[in-house]
Amino acid sequence: MKFTLSWLKDHLETDATLDEIVEKLTDIGLEVESVDDRAAFRAFTIARVLTATRHPDADKLQVLSVDTGDGKPVQVVCGAPNARAGLVGVLGRPGDYVPGLDVTLSVGKIRGVESFGMMCSERELELSDEHNGIIDLAENAPVGTSFAAYMGLDDPIIEIGLTPNRADCTGIRGIARDLAAAGLGTLKNTLPDAVKGEGETPVKVILDQDAGNPFCTGFALRMVKGVKNGPSPKWMQQRLKAIGLRPINALVDITNYVTFDQGRPLHVFDAAKVKGNLTVRTARDGETILALDQREYKLNAGMYVIADENGPESIAGIMGGEHSGCDENTVDVLIESALWDPRMIARTGRELGIVTDARYRFERGVDPEMMVPGAEIATKLVLELCGGQPTVLDVVGYKPHTARVIDFPVTEVKRLTGLDVSYEDAFDILKRLGFGVEGDGKTIRATVPSWRGDVEGKADLVEEVMRIHGINRIDPQPLPSHGAVNGRILTTLQIRTRHARRMLASRGMMEAVTYSFISEAQAKAFGGGKPELKLANPIAADMSDMRPSLLPGLLAAAQRNADRGFGDIALFEVSGIYEGDTPDKQRRVAGGVRRGTAKVEGAGRFWAGNAAPVGVFDAKADALAALEAAGAPVDRIQIEAGGPEWLHPGRSGTLKLGPKVVLGTFGEFHPDTLEALDVSGALCGFEVYLDAIPEPKAKSARTKPALSLSLFQSLKRDYAFVVDAAVEAGNVVKAVSSADKKLIVGVQVFDIFTGASLGEGKKSIAVEVLLQPQDRTLTDEDLEALSKQIVASVAKQTGGVLRG
């Protein structure tokens, strides 16, 4: 929200300096984002060229004699092609800083001729990119006066950042009201008396809507006959230009001016272009309108328009139509001031992709009691600037605003903020903010003004009192120290999240943060799409569902990188997924994808050979590493073949702890899944559920145990077992490991063989067993006994026999 200092002072009687106003705005919650006081222009003056003669030593230079208004002409050397006798321009004197050149002027000689200043171009003053000649002002421009004052460039521009709840400050009057309440001046009464009209407005307004659920809660219309439309006055144009608006003509500029002045959007129709009456109705599927931005918009039945017999003339509350717009030929003008449903405005604007100042205000909620005064203000300006004869203001469908009343115990300020504010101070603050107040010395009965639709309860009143009284008046209090070491601050889930994140990053994966919202198609592809997980008001059509998995977002991110030349990429995310609409259905998950040749050991081409594409075992290793880092008992994890439907059925697995606890899934993606998501390439991924890891039975130590190393040499033994073809290698590994958990420290599968020599339906699984004695060197008898234990364990758990 931008405004100039002089514009603010139209509403605020104050002697405060610019710095004081800026500081106070931030103190009361209207954060100042920038201030342009345009001090660089103050030194430049308007000057007239008396004579222009050719430079004796340069064909392209002229020696000017310049009148500065004090009767003492100044000699200036100038190379501008438009420099001539009689031109009125802008003079910079020695000592003046030229912002466009980043230089400070001084007396100098140019080709032997002294120059005591500089005639400036627009680019040199950073007014525009025009530099083909020096500034050429009107002949009647007052010579010797400040150029900044003449052009309105001496008025500082302030820009503040508004939070969505402060709709009242989308108008300069609302900002002035807050400053007055904060003690920085007095709020002026700028509302004009009602304009006395003659005769009824010939164009009637018809509200075609559901009376029980209206989208238009008030419509005011007035005609002003016999206007003379043309350029708006200089003061209005200067203010509009200062805040970034382009002046068009007086009638249009008046509506823009009132929008920013009062926070009340308006619209004007050329009455001669309106056929019949105006009807506020829903749009019809397929209707189109050529809007004022010269773009044609296709409407649907969920949108609302102001239409006449020709069809839509305005997209309600957002933008008018080109057909009925006002131009220099307008004689009779219709002034519209209406109230629109904020949700309808937001939805329509989002669907059409239109962002306007009117939409910005209506979707936040405008002051309902300013509908009629806004029309009166605009009428008064039209009569002053364009003349004409007004009709009686026609108001349709408007119901007086019902004010909200809140009982406010002043003790709530202390309870919620720690700020000590007396009853009298709180009473006075709310009164200055425009609240109706009465009370008994302890509780204030506050009536919320119409422009503060965001104030709904006691906590909101606490905020109002606190920000005006001054947050900076809260005395700092040091945190108490009890002389003891703090206990663990992070929760178990937070610790798991941190450890999993560090582990995946250490494996060469890059962390990504993706949206929690995905499209319906993506959600259904990953087991989601439940009705309760659909957003009532999605920010985009392809972000309609809460995600049931991290993988859709990561796959899309990987594809975006691949499309830009980064095909070998590994991404991970540790965040939440949603299985339902209750808090217990939100899960903490670590997920990741690898694409191309993005393996742990490196990607791309090497002297020893190209890296292989990623596959199921890369995803498995990532999943187990994340679980181990998060504290899962990986030695007890069971790996079952097959995963969810979005993974390849023969190249995926499920990580389980017992028959019921699922810790995660991993694998290569199903081709149908990749096709549905428009993703290509070698891709694998995993998800592990950090909240499914069981709590350790024993309390975990805060420090790592001491490193224990055996004094005795380790040794390896190989075994080959013949088992049924359906037996998984993991079961054999588990059986071997359980034979002697103290002595056996590692089991590795190194060969799987099938053949006729083994018999039908049989296969051989060979494993390498790593033995680590702790207290003595193993004898042949020890090894023989261990071998018997291993063979017996495998036979018992898998039915396998030692291969001969």
UniProtKB/Swiss-Prot annotation:
Residues that, per the record, bind Mg(2+): 454, 460, 463-464
CDD domains: PheRS_beta_core, tRNA_bind_bactPheRS
Disulfide bonds: none
InterPro entries per record: aa-tRNA-synth_II/BPL/LPL, B3/B4_tRNA-bd, DNA-bd_dom_put_sf, Fdx_antiC-bd, Fdx_antiC-bd_sf, NA-bd_OB-fold, Phe-tRNA-ligase_IIc_bsu, Phe-tRNA-ligase_IIc_bsu_bact
Gene Ontology biological process terms from the UniProt entry: phenylalanyl-tRNA aminoacylation
Subcellular location: Cytoplasm
Enzyme class: ligase
Cited PANTHER family: PHENYLALANINE--TRNA LIGASE BETA SUBUNIT (PTHR10947:SF0), PHENYLALANYL-TRNA SYNTHETASE BETA CHAIN AND LEUCINE-RICH REPEAT-CONTAINING PROTEIN 47 (PTHR10947)
Protein name (Swiss-Prot/TrEMBL): Phenylalanine--tRNA ligase beta subunit
Organism listed in the record: Brucella suis biovar 1 (strain 1330)
